Amino acid sequence: MIFLIFSFIVLLIFGLANVYIYKRLIKKITLFKYFYKIFSFIFIVLFLAQAVFLIFRRDEYLSDTWYEILAMFYAPTYCLFFMTLAWDFVKLILALMGKRDKTYNLILRLIFELSLIVLSVFLIYASINNALKTPEVKSVDVEIPNLKKDLKIVMLTDIHLGKNLHENFLDKLITKVNLQSPDMVVIVGDLIDTNPKDLKNYISKLNDFNSTYGTFYALGNHEYYHGINEVLDLLRKHTNMKILVNQNLDLGFIDIAGLGDLAGLDRGLYAPDLARIKVDLNTSKASILLTHQPKTALLYDLSDFDLVLSGHTHGGQIFPFMFLVKLQQGFVHGLYDLGEKTKLYVSSGAGFWGPSLRVFAPSEIVILNLKGKK
């Protein structure tokens, strides 16, 4: 039911946006004067593609190729909507400036129209490319008083391996991570976003991450959506990652723990169990907690940990959704102080969810340079 309501709202928003763009932008552009019927057809196809993607995106019968193509059809509407707002704003300014020479107005209008078309094409390309490209590397220094030696950690979240991001994306991600020569790699949830059996042929490539202490993994909410036990079986069988589900590992100089995701509370499987983790936690040593959703820090007392690592938010992924994410999660992206001792880093993620769109929320591979207090 929630999925149906969500789908209806999204389609209503994009349907109205398409109508607004066509009536307020396309039909007003002089350069498109003889192509209105063609654009009418284009916008009908655009909306139908958006509807098909939204309705069937969870369907196994939608091939990877069609999924990738349909996921791009949201970018034109999104970008053109803001271009239309800009168009209406400029027209308002010109109206307030009063009457001018007709020739001057026509030249000015044509220049603006041409600029708008070029900018729209660029924005559509950039928003799709920002989602699909290999993430950039971001370096963050974090001071941890109890840490006995410096540590370089690569943090990955929200890779979302599935119908849109698959083997080729993972290969590039691994190559870029290995160039950083990390001491350890942590994957903080939403690694898998499809039926686990679809990843069987290449999921073992996760073993190609090279680091001193290995790769550590905690659950995300999307793993629950695709059969949490099947996901865990796949990862345990085909990878050598250290899977932390309400578990703490003592590495000698540091403790690293992984908490079950909040999605487990609704499903009654692998729900967060902080008490279980704290049984083995040595609070006199440096410690890291992997927990996918940052709002965990608002629901649980995490003050025993030095560093909490989260993802889930995608940095908002699409402007202006970062403001809604802030309301829902309490945190969006970056380094936060949770108290005297505890710090939280929320990553914008390596992949994306839903439409192939990232606007003002770039993906990232995070290098955490942990330094003991000198």
Swiss-Prot record:
Signal peptide (from-to): none
PANTHER family (UniProt xref): PHOSPHODIESTERASE YAEI (PTHR31302:SF31), TRANSMEMBRANE PROTEIN WITH METALLOPHOSPHOESTERASE DOMAIN-RELATED (PTHR31302)
Cofactor requirement: a divalent metal cation
UniProt keyword annotations, A-Z: Hydrolase, Metal-binding
Residue numbers binding a divalent metal cation 1: D158, H160, D190, H314
Residues that, per the record, bind a divalent metal cation 2: D190, N221, H312
Family designation: Belongs to the metallophosphoesterase superfamily.
A GO MF term: metal ion binding
Enzyme Commission number, as recorded: 3.1.-.-
UniProt-recorded name of the protein: Uncharacterized metallophosphoesterase Cj0846
Free-text cofactor note: Binds 2 divalent metal cations.
Key word Nucleotide-binding present: no
Gene Ontology cellular component list: membrane
Root EC class: hydrolase
Organism: Campylobacter jejuni subsp. jejuni serotype O:2 (strain ATCC 700819 / NCTC 11168)
Lineage: superkingdom: Bacteria
GO biological process: lipid A biosynthetic process
